[in-house]
Design a protein with these regions (language model features):
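Small/polar-rich, solvent-exposed N-terminal microdomains that initiate assembly or binding
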Residues: 2-66, 126
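A generic structural motif
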Residues: 3, 89-98, 165
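Active-site-adjacent structural patch at catalytic or cofactor/ligand-binding sites
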Residues: 53-92
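"Short basic amphipathic alpha-helical interaction patches in structured regions
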Residues: 64-69, 97-107, 124-126
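Oligomerization/assembly interface segments of phage tail-like spikes and tubes
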Residues: 77-92, 107-108, 153-163
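Acidic-leaning, charged glycine-interspersed low-complexity segments
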Residues: 110-166
């Protein structure tokens, strides 16, 4: 499921849609209260924030071959990426509910991510399906993410989506090799 440069925002929106469909209105009234938002966003009034905090090349991914296009053209293979997300409660929100409700929301969010572990099923093979994985980060690793943002630690869920295949726009033309024929007897 290769896609052009919008693939990163497409994946973010797909995760957002998944959370909105499965958490609203049962635990959070309005779908708009679950938002793609950086924790540094001062005035945003959302309850649950989805924040993309890192993008890395997926090195273990089986590198694909050049892709044959029409005519004498080949396209360079896609770059496989891993996207890293934090899903967190926005403590600055006016809508902020009590601690018990926050924990119920986070519990439901984990359940949703587990139950929809395959975000995109490309139908080809397991390796190309973008999957959600909960990250086993230590408390120290989590606090580092927040201290970099200069924000007090927030309770959250950390997960990755991978592989996300970012297609190349680089195309190469090749000459078809024509078999050279010559008569051996003429080579004296």
């Amino acid at each position: 499921n290769m896609a052009d440069f919008s693939i990163i925002s497409d994946v973010s929106n797909e995760v957002l849609k998944l959370l909105r469909e499965n958490i609203c209105p049962e635990l959070i009234q309005s779908p708009e209260s679950i938002a793609l938002a950086a924790p540094t966003d001062k005035n945003a009034d959302f309850q649950l924030g989805l924040y993309l905090y890192d993008i890395q090349e997926l090195r273990e991914y089986q590198q694909q071959d050049m892709i044959r296009l029409r005519g004498n053209m080949t396209q360079y293979p896609p770059k496989p990426l891993t996207l890293y997300f934090a899903l967190y409660m926005n403590t600055k929100s006016q809508l902020m509910s009590n601690v018990e409700n926050e924990q119920r929301i986070l519990g439901r969010a984990i359940q949703v991510l587990m139950d929809h572990a395959i975000l995109y099923d490309t139908g080809e093979d397991e390796d190309t399906s973008a999957s959600i994985t909960l990250l086993p980060l230590s408390y120290e690793e989590k606090t580092k993410i927040w201290s970099v943002l200069s924000i007090p630690y927030q309770l959250g869920i950390y997960f990755s989506v991978s592989p996300v295949l970012l297609s190349s726009r680089r195309i190469r033309s090749f000459r078809r090799v024509v078999a050279a024929e010559f008569d051996v007897s003429q080579r004296q």
